From Swiss-Prot:
Interacts with nocte. In the antenna, detected in neurons of the arista and also detected in sacculus neurons which innervate the first and second chambers (at protein level). Throughout the main body of the antenna, expressed in neurons which innervate the coeloconic class of olfactory sensilla (at protein level). Expressed in multiple cells of the dorsal organ including the dorsal organ cool cells (at protein level). Detected in femur and retina. Expressed in a subset of femur chordonotal neurons and antennal Johnston's Organ neurons. SUPFAM superfamilies: Periplasmic binding protein-like I, Periplasmic binding protein-like II, Voltage-gated potassium channels. The gene is Ir25a. It is a multi-pass membrane protein. It comes from the Eukaryota. Glycans are attached at residues 78, 177, 277, 434, 687, 715, 762. Residues 31-562, 663-858 are extracellular. Keywords: Behavior, Biological rhythms, Cell membrane, Cell projection, Glycoprotein, Ion channel, Ion transport, Ligand-gated ion channel, Membrane, Olfaction, Receptor, Sensory transduction, Signal, Transmembrane, Transmembrane helix, Transport. The chain crosses the membrane at residues 563-583, 642-662, 859-879. It comes from Drosophila melanogaster (Fruit fly). This is Ionotropic receptor 25a. InterPro entries: Glu/Gly-bd, Iono_Glu_rcpt_met, Ionotropic_Glu_rcpt, Iontro_rcpt_C, K_chnl_dom, Peripla_BP_I. Pfam families: Ion_trans_2 (PF07885), Lig_chan (PF00060), Lig_chan-Glu_bd (PF10613).
Length: 947
């Protein structure tokens, strides 16, 4: 017998009581514990889901307060063979039926693709209550589309965080107005179903592609290909390791201001990279403060450490919530007692068991605390649950600057709360703008004044109507651009093999974003590229020719006759004048030799040499020469001169009139028909231009109609009646364009506009050339050059528009901008600037018209003749006055001097000394007086010498 200490006995009694109490509690708990059967289907590589479900089971065992025991059967689903997976599921399900352990719930954590759709098909066909964490929004789960109302209550889907996080890209694109984007993702995200829905109804050109896994070189090539698609906004969805690999594969030049990089991850760490200079936007999840303690407990106590924490916490909370939902339904009596379970082999396509099971209602009402974020579940029965339910959490937005291979600065500038169409919450808008890539578009153009002209002093090296237009559009749409000329100088034409050149080819090859210039909208171009609304009026083809001009001359009247003719006329004038003087001097019947005979005539005209010159000159004028010589021989000479002068004057007058009017009477080419009918002037458009295409196609169309006519006319199978009906159709098809196209080919099409202008300017009367081209180009050349003119009316009119890539978002943006400028009359101001106020416009003389009179440029020489004649007369007057005033006059002598001189005259008869005639008396003296008298008649009476 053992004696106990009373104190020891008391302790033993207390321990026994506690043991009994514990056993009683366990027995009570065992009686209230709810057992449920769950079939867990998970993909092979979805470790966070597998680990989370395992932790849930441990968590429930250690927390008996839940009163829940889960009998879990697991299936690892392969992602490539639906048949194998379906057999595995059916076998597991059949076994549970045999054991009478049919699953209350199918917990599906397959992600997407074959595995997910196989599970959805299985559960939908057999009517099994399912809670799925598969990826996809409404309509993405093909096997769960168009569910009836009953199935919508027990086939539920909650989107995992990795399916919600890509929606942040949509929010960023909208907030920052991004027009292009490349989205690279790794295996931690599933994007197959996001291609159409992610940026739907947003004017953002984007590419979604998986990150190249082969190596750094492959990733570099991948990024280079994306750059060739003219993308400068990059989004990286992946683990921190994947983000680092991509960043280290990027060329340093791609971190400049015209590029933007965004890294988005499910992990909570920091980015490490060997980049020397990079600034990126970094988004990572951030647990709500109120849940951090619970998450820490799960990580430390229950070993919920699988990365990423966000996914692990989601799967944990989803599994726990799902199990508690089944428990609540079972204990509340909401679970049907006569659940029918159909084996896979018994399913015949339309015998799915009918369920009266509202799993959705109980699932949304569970109030169990979460470990990372709350569940945002659709509670309204009228709204779809699947594709709209998810876990709500925050993503922190950071500006991350990497210098020298490490993050030197990380600043939080906002946050994004997970959701569909959730907006960014930005704290620092200025920093957010700095993360935006400068939108720079590549423009290719063709120099064509006044639309595009080179100017080294201009900001972009070019000026013109289109440069001003694109600058106005850029101010509205907010972008920058680079501009360069296309190598071949062509807007774009398609050859016989369907190959394009010029700007069109650049746009098709994605080497250009915008085609700018005087580019016509053509049907075949619209097949491969897009055009904006027209920014200019309809422009057709017209004709440019050299302006006809006759050289003007002040002495035009002298050019009527050639120099040799003028010299001959002058020689005839002097010869006739000299001959008339000789005849008058030697003819015994002339006035000077018969003064007594003609002393009573009113006209006493002595034809000395001076008088003969005057007579012949005045005879050529309407005034006439005056009195003719008295002798017959002189009159014959005068008559001959008059006849000669009449013929010369008549010929001169006729030629002068012809010279002044013939240039204005030439019939010019006034239309395309006139050009086609003549053969003197060659004509052609630019090689490869739209005008060339027009004439070539018109020629081909005429040829096609000719072939049709020929086939009908020469068809021997036609009956006489049928042939008679075609009798009126002899040859109604015009060959106008066929002949014109042949003439153009013979004339050789110019390669450039400068060559065409040079050929027009070098045109002569024998080898003329006319250029056919766009009316705007030709009209501008006319405005800037006085030797060119526009001929005829425009034809084949087409609008000018800006070209963009087919399907480009720029089309709608530019359309809105152009319409805005049109409403503001800004386009009219540009026309005014470049067509009326341009400094390059030439000030040309008014072209001559047939109704205009003779210009001063051609007749002004006669006024010069008048002024020269009047000037010579004035000079002669001065000389006469001088001669009269300062010549040596005869002196007056007295009688004594006269007597002395008379004595001297005897020795020198007939000599004039100091105005006195020295002579002698008698017959000889009288004869001397008679001979010298005419000589002194020219002196005034006061100064006549004394005899």
């Amino acid at each position: 017998m053992i004696l106990m200490n009373p104190k020891t006995s008391k302790i033993l009694w207390l321990l026994g009581f506690l043991s009994l109490l514990s056993s009683f509690s366990l027995e009570i708990a065992a009686q209230t514990t709810q057992n449920i059967n769950v079939l867990f289907i998970n993909e092979v590589d979805n470790e966070p889901a597998a680990k989370a479900v395992e932790v849930v089971l441990t968590y429930l065992k250690k927390n008996i307060r839940y009163g829940l025991s889960v009998q879990l059967d697991s299936i690892e689903a392969n992602k490539s063979d639906a048949k194998v997976l379906l057999e595995a599921i059916c076998n597991k399900y059949a076994t549970s039926i045999e054991k009478k352990q049919t699953p209350h719930l199918i917990l599906d954590t397959t992600k997407s693709g074959i595995a997910s759709e196989t599970v959805k098909s299985f559960t939908q066909a057999l009517g099994l209550p399912t809670i799925s964490a598969s990826y996809g929004q409404q309509g993405d789960l093909r096997q769960w589309r168009d569910l009836d109302e009953a199935k919508q209550k027990y086939l539920l889907q909650v989107m995992p965080p990795a399916d919600i996080i890509p929606e942040a890209i949509r929010s960023i694109v909208i907030h920052m107005n991004i027009t292009n984007a490349a989205i690279l993702y790794d295996d931690s995200f599933v994007m197959d179903h996001k291609y159409k829905s992610l940026l739907q109804n947003i004017q953002t050109r984007h590419v979604i592609t998986a990150i190249a896994k082969d190596g750094k070189r492959e990733r570099e090539e991948q990024i280079e290909k994306l750059r060739n698609l003219d993308i400068n906004n990059f989004f990286i969805l992946g683990t921190l390791q994947s983000i680092r690999m991509v960043l280290e594969s990027v060329k340093p030049a791609y971190f400049e201001r015209n590029f933007a990089w965004h890294a988005i991850t499910q992990n909570e760490g920091e980015i490490s990279s060997q980049r020397d200079n990079a600034t990126i936007m970094f988004m990572k999840p951030m647990a709500y403060t109120q849940y951090r303690d619970r998450l820490g407990l799960l990580r430390t106590t229950y070993n919920l450490n699988e990365e990423p924490q966000l996914s692990s916490a989601f799967y944990f909370d989803l599994a726990l919530r799902s199990f508690l939902t089944i428990k609540e339904m079972l204990q509340s009596g909401a679970w049907p007692k006569d659940m029918e379970y159909l084996n896979c082999d018994d399913f015949q396509g339309g015998n799915t068991p009918q369920r009266n099971l509202d799993l959705r209602d109980y699932f949304t009402k569970i109030t169990e605390p979460t470990s990372y974020g709350t569940f945002d579940l659709v509670t309204q029965s009228t709204q779809p649950f699947n594709g709209h339910s998810f876990m709500k959490f925050e993503m922190d937005i950071n500006v991350l600057q990497i210098r020298g291979g490490s993050s030197v600065n990380s600043k939080s500038i906002g946050k994004w709360i997970s959701g569909l169409n959730s907006e960014l919450i930005v704290k620092d808008e200025e920093q957010m703008k700095n993360l935006t890539a400068d939108t720079v578009y590549r423009i290719f153009t063709v120099v064509q004044a006044p639309f595009i002209m080179r100017d080294e002093t201009a900001p972009k090296g070019y000026k013109g109507y289109c440069i001003d237009l694109i600058n106005e559009i850029a101010a509205i749409v907010h972008f920058d651009y680079t501009i360069q000329e296309v190598e071949d100088g062509k807007f774009g034409n398609m050859d016989e093999n369907g190959q394009w050149n010029g700007i069109v080819k650049k746009l098709m090859d994605k080497q250009a974003d915008i085609g700018l210039g005087s580019m016509s909208v053509m049907a075949e171009r619209e097949i491969v590229i897009d055009f904006t609304v027209p920014y200019y009026d309809l422009v057709g083809i017209t004709i440019m020719m050299q302006r006809p001009s006759s050289p003007s001359s002040l002495f035009k009247f002298l050019t009527v006759l050639e120099t040799n003719v003028w010299l001959c006329i002058l020689a005839a004038y002097f010869f006739t004048s000299f001959l008339m003087w000789i005849f008058d001097r030697w003819s015994p019947y002339s006035y000077q030799n018969n003064r007594e005979k003609y002393k009573d005539d009113e006209e006493k005209r002595e034809f000395n040499l001076k008088e003969c010159l005057w007579f012949c000159m005045t005879s050529l004028t309407p005034q006439g020469g005056g009195e003719a010589p008295k002798n017959l021989s002189g009159r014959l000479v005068a008559a001959t001169w008059w006849l000669f002068g009449f013929i010369i004057i008549a010929s001169y007058t006729a030629n002068l009139a012809a010279f002044l009017t013939v240039s204005r009477l030439d019939t010019p080419v006034e239309s395309l028909d006139d050009l086609a009918k003549q053969y003197k002037i060659l004509y052609a458009p630019l090689n490869g231009s739209s005008a060339m295409t027009y004439f070539e196609r018109m020629s081909n169309i005429e040829q096609m109609f000719y072939e049709i006519w020929k086939d009908l006319s020469l068809n021997d199978s036609l009956t006489a009646v049928e042939r008679s009906k075609l009798a009126v159709w002899d040859y109604p098809v015009s060959d106008k364009y066929t002949k014109m196209w042949q003439a153009m080919q013979e004339a050789k099409l110019p390669a450039t506009l400068d060559e065409a202008v040079a050929r027009v300017r070098n045109s002569t009367a024998a080898t003329g050339f006319a250029f056919l081209g766009d009316a705007t180009d030709i009209r501008y050349l006319q405005l800037t050059n006085c030797d060119l003119q526009v001929v005829g009316e425009e034809f084949s009119r087409k609008p000018y528009a800006i070209a963009v890539q087919q399907g480009s978002h720029l089309k709608d943006q530019f359309n809105n901008a152009i319409l805005t400028l049109l409403n503001k009359r800004q386009l009219e101001k540009l026309k005014e600037k470049w067509w009326k106020n341009d400094e390059a416009l030439a000030k040309c003389d008014k072209p001559e018209d047939q109704s205009d009179g003779i210009s001063i440029q051609n007749i002004g020489g006669v006024f010069i003749v008048i002024f020269v004649g009047i000037g010579m007369a004035c000079i002669t007057l001065v000389f006469e006055y001088w001669w009269y005033r300062y010549r040596k006059n005869p002196r007056i002598i007295d009688v004594a001097e006269a007597n002395a001189e008379r004595s001297n005259a005897a020795d020198h008869p007939g000599k004039l000394v100091d105005g006195v005639i020295l002579g002698h008396s008698g017959e000889k003296f009288e004869k001397s007086k008679a001979a010298l008298r005419p000589r002194f008649n020219q002196y005034p009476a006061t100064f006549k010498p004394r005899f």
